[in-house]
A protein has these predicted regions:
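Bacterial Sec-dependent N-terminal signal peptides
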Residues: 1-22
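Extracellular/lumen-exposed scaffold segments
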Residues: 20-148
């Protein structure tokens, strides 16, 4: 019975610890001239954890990636920019140069709305967080941002 209680306690402790290691996401759209919007998708990892850049090479950790859903009223312009404190180093485990964000990462995408109408842009972001000892499995977050 003591062993069963111990196993239950360990599952509970690790389950709670893992549940707390999630990225907090926030989304906003800033109106620009000529029906353009600057989309901000901000990732805030838990203290002591970091999120990887979109520019992580093959063979490295899972890069942050964005997939925008099709919307006939919205044109996604060029590539998404990244803002934040970037740390670059050679990762001995992956044997590649990696980039991650220390603290918040602001991913910025410019879009154009066809016409002067209200619509939205939706999609999903896949990311992975790590600390100096371990990584969490990649996770996917859906988003929907109003453009009005």
């Amino acid at each position: 019975m003591k062993q069963l209680a111990f196993v239950f306690m360990m599952v509970l402790v690790f389950g709670v610890a893992n549940a707390q290691q999630k990225i907090s996401w926030s989304y906003s759209a800033k109106k620009l001239p000529n029906n353009k919007y600057e989309i901000h998708i901000v990732a805030t990892p838990p203290p002591g954890w970091h999120i990887y850049s979109q520019l992580t090479p093959d063979g490295g950790p899972v890069p942050t990636t964005f997939k925008f859903s099709k919307n006939a009223l919205v044109v996604v312009q060029s590539k998404m920019n990244e803002k934040g404190k970037v740390v670059s180093y050679f990762d001995k485990n992956f044997k590649v140069d990696v980039k991650y964000f220390e603290g918040k990462a602001d991913f910025v995408q410019v879009v154009t709305v066809k016409g002067n109408i209200k619509t939205n842009i939706s999609g999903e972001v896949e990311s992975m967080i790590c600390n100096d000892r371990t990584c969490m499995p990649p996770s996917t977050e859906k988003f929907n941002i109003a453009l009005n």
